From Swiss-Prot:
Active site, per annotation: Y145
InterPro entries per record: 3Beta_OHSteriod_DH/Estase, NAD(P)-bd_dom_sf, NAD(P)-dependent_oxidoreduct
Gene this protein is translated from: nsdhl
Pfam families, alphabetized: 3Beta_HSD (PF01073)
Listed EC numbers: 1.1.1.170
Protein name as it appears in the record: Sterol-4-alpha-carboxylate 3-dehydrogenase, decarboxylating
Function: Catalyzes the NAD(P)(+)-dependent oxidative decarboxylation of the C4 methyl groups of 4-alpha-carboxysterols in post-squalene cholesterol biosynthesis.
Amino acid sequence: MKNVFLTGGSGFLGKYIIEELISNGYKVFALSRSETSNKVLSQMGATPVMSSLHDEQGLTEAIKGCDIVIHCAAKLETNSESVQELYKDNIDATELLFNICNQSSTSSVSVFCFISSEGVIMNGENINNATEDTPYPPIEQLGWYNKSKAISEQFLLATQSSMSRMKTIVIRLPLVWGSRDNVLDYLVGLCNKFQWFWIGGGKNYLSIVHAKNASYGIRLAIEKGDNQDIFHLTDGESVQYRKFFTDRFKKKGVSTNKLHMVLPTPIALSLVWIMALIWKLFNLKGLPLLTKTGLIYSSKNFTINDDKARLKLGYTNKINYNQGMDEL
C-alpha cells in the first residue's frame, strides 16, 4: 500500500481524488486546517493532517512516510481577498511544498503531482484542440489565477531535472464538473435572481472534465507518468458553453425563462476594465465579480486535446456527459 499526501482534499475535486485513491488501495493523508475539514476527511476514509500550506515544519512532518504528493489546493479568483493572497497561496505555497518534497535527505516522496489548469495557455484568442506542447503566452496576457498556475508550472518543470530522484507530473484540467459542486449552487442562485448573462451569446465551445474522470486520470498519471510529463484530461468531446450551463441549470430546477439575457462582448470587456479600476482605486476586498479570465472563458472557444493521456496512460472516461448530468 502506497501513502499519498493530498492538499485540497476537502474541496470539490479533492473529495473525488480521495475516493479514487482509497478504492484502489492507497492510504491517503490529507491536509486539513479546521475541525470541520477533519470530520469530512475522516468520514471519507482519509487521515487528516493539521497544518498549513505555509507551515514549513508542519508540511515536513506531514509528508513523512509518504510516497506520493498530490497538490490540489488552490485559491481561486472567486474566493480570494486580494491578488497578493492568491499569489501567496498558489505560487509561494507550491514552491514551499515542492522544495520540502525534493529534499533527498529527509523526504521519501517519489512523485510530486501538481494539479494545474488549461488556463496557463489562455492568450485571449480562440484556442481549439490545444496539446500539451502549446507554448505559454506572455505572462502579462494571463489573468491572476492562470498566471499563478503558469508561474508554478514553470518553476516546477525548470527546477526538476530529468535525472531527479522525484518525478514531477503536471495535470492540466479544463472546467471540472459533477455533483457536490458548490460553485454550481452559487451560479444557480445568480440565475434565480436574474443575474446570469450569456456573454456574446454563449456560443463558444469549451472542454470539460467530470470530477470522476479527472480523479481517475490523476491516479493513472501518478502510476504511469514520467518525470516532467504534462497531461491534459477531458471528457473527450467539447461542448457549447451555453448548452453545458443550461443543461446543468435545468437539472437544478432553474426555469429557462431566467436564461435568456445576453451581454454583448464589448460591453462585458468594458465592465472588466471598469471593475478592475474601481477595485484598485477604492482598495476593495476580494476580486471583481467579472475578471479577464472569466470573460475569456465565457466568450472564446477553449478546447484542449487529451490524446497523450489516452495513449500513454490508458485514460478513458469513467462517466459520460449524460450520466454526469443525471447525477446532478
